[in-house]
Structures are given as structure tokens and as C-alpha cells.
């Protein structure tokens, strides 16, 4: 099976046809939006994938009250479908859901200084990611924040195993309830 493969800024990228590994049975397009209010950046990623993750089509993670990442995926399974449809992230209002997680990012470090962040919409997991190797981008990476169960499920499938030079560990735990107010009684 062959799929379109590329990564680029915006809603399209200069692709080539890639022969998929034996266990890969679907073509996948990821549209990722990184929002650091008031700015947003869209990245498109096309690759081979596995069809048992296609139901995980929408994911979110929040790093800060004004910084979040939204991911929408589309799959196309079968020999006659090398070009999956564009996922199309729509506008969405994501209100806080009263859950919290520790959050931080370290772009060149396996450690970072945590702060508490409010989870939004369907984010009910606390995500911790540690990258020991991250391709051409980073030699170390740490990330903590709120996440959707779908993002945790996709990470559990280790979808990046086919990518070279990426070594990432992650952990998801249930998000924390609102901090209780201490009383002076």
C-alpha cells in the first residue's frame, strides 16, 4: 500500500508517495492547530497509519489557559485510497470543565517548572510526555498538561514508531478535581 506523505505549515504540504510498512493499512492526515492566543499556527501531516486508531479522530491538550493544541485526523483505508480527505478543524468554544493538571513545557530539557492549568471541554486526563530523541527538532523535550482520552489512547498505540529518530515516553493519569478551599475553622 502507498500513501501520500509530508509535513508542512498551513492546510497543505508538498507530498510524495510512500510505501507503507506491512502493519500499516490506512492513509492518515493530521491537521494540528497550535493556539497561543491571539495567534494560531496550523500544521498538516500526512502518513501511513493503522486503521484501528481511525476512531480517534479528535484530540486536544492544554498547556496554559491561553495555549492549547487541537488535532483532527482523517483516515482512508484500502488500496484505492492513498489520499485521505482533509480533516477540517472547525471553530470550537472550549470552556473550562473544573478539572486541573500540572502543566509545563521544556523544549530542550527533560524537566520543566510546573504550574496548575484548567482543563477544557472533554479534557479529563493529565498528560506527561518526555522526549529523549525527537528527530531533527529536539534532543530533549518535556511536556505536561490536560489531554483528551482520545489523545492518550492514540499515544498508547505509539503511532510514531515508524518514524525515525523519535524516542518518546508518555503517561496519562486522571485529571484532578478543583482544588478545595481551605477553611479557617
From Swiss-Prot:
Similarity comment: Belongs to the CNF-like-inhibitor family.
Tissue specificity as recorded in UniProt: Expressed by the liver.
The organism of origin for this protein: Naja kaouthia (Monocled cobra)
UniProt-annotated location(s): Secreted
Subunit structure as annotated in this protein's UniProt entry: Heterodimer with phospholipase A2 inhibitor 31 kDa.
Disulfide pairings: 3-27, 6-13, 20-48, 54-75, 76-81, 101-126, 119-146, 152-172
Protein name per Swiss-Prot or TrEMBL: Phospholipase A2 inhibitor 25 kDa subunit
Keywords associated with the record: Disulfide bond, Phospholipase A2 inhibitor, Secreted
Record SUPFAM superfamilies: Snake toxin-like
A single Gene Ontology CC term: extracellular region
GO molecular function, one term: phospholipase A2 inhibitor activity
Amino acid at each position: 500500500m502507498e500513501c501520500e506523505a509530508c509535513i508542512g505549515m498551513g492546510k497543505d504540504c508538498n507530498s510524495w508517495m510512500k510505501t507503507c510498512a506491512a502493519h500499516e493499512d490506512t492513509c492518515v492526515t493530521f491537521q494540528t492547530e497550535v493556539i497561543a492566543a491571539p495567534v494560531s499556527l496550523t500544521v498538516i501531516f500526512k502518513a501511513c497509519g493503522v486503521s484501528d486508531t481511525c476512531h480517534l479522530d479528535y484530540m486536544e491538550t492544554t498547556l496554559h489557559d491561553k495555549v492549547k493544541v487541537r488535532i483532527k485526523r482523517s483516515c482512508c483505508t484500502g488500496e484505492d485510497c492513498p489520499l485521505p480527505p482533509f480533516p477540517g478543524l472547525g471553530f470550537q468554544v472550549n470552556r473550562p470543565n473544573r478539572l486541573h493538571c500540572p502543566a509545563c513545557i521544556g523544549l530542550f530539557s527533560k524537566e520543566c517548572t510546573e504550574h496548575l492549568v484548567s482543563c477544557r471541554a472533554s479534557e479529563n486526563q493529565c498528560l506527561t510526555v518526555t522526549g529523549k530523541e525527537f528527530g531533527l527538532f529536539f534532543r530533549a523535550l518535556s511536556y505536561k498538561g490536560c489531554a483528551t482520552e482520545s489523545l492518550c489512547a492514540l499515544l498508547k498505540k505509539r503511532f510514531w514508531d515508524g518514524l525515525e529518530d523519535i524516542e518518546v515516553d508518555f503517561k496519562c493519569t486522571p485529571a484532578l478535581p478543583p482544588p478545595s478551599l481551605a477553611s479557617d475553622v
